Amino acid sequence: MLQPKRTKFRKVHKGRNRGLAQGTDVSFGTFGLKAVGRGRLTARQIEAARRAMTRAVKRQGKIWIRVFPDKPITEKPLAVRMGKGKGNVEYWVALIQPGKVLYEMDGVPEELAREAFKLAAAKLPIKTTFVTKTVM
């Protein structure tokens, strides 16, 4: 699972997921999976989608993961009263804004890439679309 090796602080504020994304262009591969909606992806969801894509292309070509879960999410244990401090870090998430390229792929035909991204998109909680690299 993806998570930072070390962070400056163990826990962070909840914050808000506003604004537009950085990294909106396909830059490494030829095809990409771009987020249309806004939300957050857990490390498990990112890994599940990656596995689905890898199996679909039968380990051909190359896949790039363009998102990294760098925000810790805390939870308090079951049946614990409110207060007494912030809970423990349970999992890590990546905040996603519309337009962010989540995955990229190269070295496979377009039809196979579309099918692989369709399988990956089913594992994700946000709406996505298929994009190709624009050559100027």
Swiss-Prot record:
Could you identify this protein by its name? Large ribosomal subunit protein uL16
Going by the entry's taxonomy, the superkingdom of the source organism is recorded as Bacteria
**Job of this protein:** Binds 23S rRNA and is also seen to make contacts with the A and possibly P site tRNAs.
Note whether Ribosomal protein occurs among the keywords. Answer: yes
The family line of this record is: Belongs to the universal ribosomal protein uL16 family.
Which molecular-function annotation in GO is an example for this chain? structural constituent of ribosome
Q: Can you name a GO cellular component term?
A: cytosolic large ribosomal subunit
Q: Which NCBIfam families match?
A: rplP_bact
What GO biological process, any one, is recorded here? translation
Q: What gene is it encoded by?
A: rplP
Binding partners and assembly: Part of the 50S ribosomal subunit.
Spell out the Pfam families in the cross-references. Answer: Ribosomal_L16
**Entry keyword annotation includes tRNA-binding:** yes
Q: Write down the species.
A: Edwardsiella ictaluri (strain 93-146)
Which SUPFAM superfamilies does this chain map to? Ribosomal protein L16p/L10e
* Lineage, opening ranks: Bacteria, Pseudomonadati, Pseudomonadota, Gammaproteobacteria, Enterobacterales
Cross-referenced InterPro entries: Ribosomal_uL16, Ribosomal_uL16_bact-type, Ribosomal_uL16_CS, Ribosomal_uL16_dom, Ribosomal_uL16_sf
Keywords of this entry = Ribonucleoprotein, Ribosomal protein, RNA-binding, rRNA-binding, tRNA-binding
